[in-house]
Amino acid sequence: MSIMPTLDMDKDTFTQVGYLYNLLDKIGHLGLFERDLSCYMLEVLAVDSQNMREINFAHRAKNSTTDVLSFPLDVSEGADSHILAKQMKICLGSVVINYELAQKVAKQRGHSTQDEISLLFIHGFLHILGYDHEVDNGEQRALEQKIIESLGLKESLIVRNTT
């Protein structure tokens, strides 16, 4: 899978989120997903808190900022979809990360901004793939935990927000 960065911030931010390419590659090589992720691409947007508030209001009618939002695109799983994906690199959707809030939370929790963005990215990516911790029976929580442990990260976003 490839990442199509659409960064709404300065050049330094682009450099700092470049590691997401490697993170996504590592996630793909864990062998946790049925579909071949190399056939798809994913848009990642890094925005500030004000822009995230506006996006959250426009799409969820919540007039507050948040850390990560996901916008999956409807990708057919028909017989020809995999062939088409290999030829065209179909976009699965967009993950929007509040870079400003990620920096703040990382400082509060005593870990790097890169680790915080990694947690947000993993969480958003699983939503793109159709997982939903608000309605599933723990599938997203379990998979998120497996991924972060495999990558040596500290805590699941879902677990952190329920404690």
From Swiss-Prot:
The keyword Hydrolase applies. Its EC number is 3.1.-.-. Keywords: Cytoplasm, Endonuclease, Hydrolase, Metal-binding, Nuclease, Ribosome biogenesis, rRNA processing, Zinc. Coiled coil: none annotated. InterPro entries: MetalPrtase_cat_dom_sf_prd, YbeY, YbeY_CS. One of its GO terms (cellular component) is cytoplasm. Binds 1 zinc ion. GO terms for molecular function: metalloendopeptidase activity; RNA endonuclease activity; zinc ion binding. It is found in: Cytoplasm. Zn(2+) binds at residues 123, 127, 133. Pfam families: YbeY. PROSITE patterns: UPF0054. Its cofactor is Zn(2+). GO terms for biological process: rRNA processing. Single strand-specific metallo-endoribonuclease involved in late-stage 70S ribosome quality control and in maturation of the 3' terminus of the 16S rRNA. Belongs to the endoribonuclease YbeY family. This is Endoribonuclease YbeY.
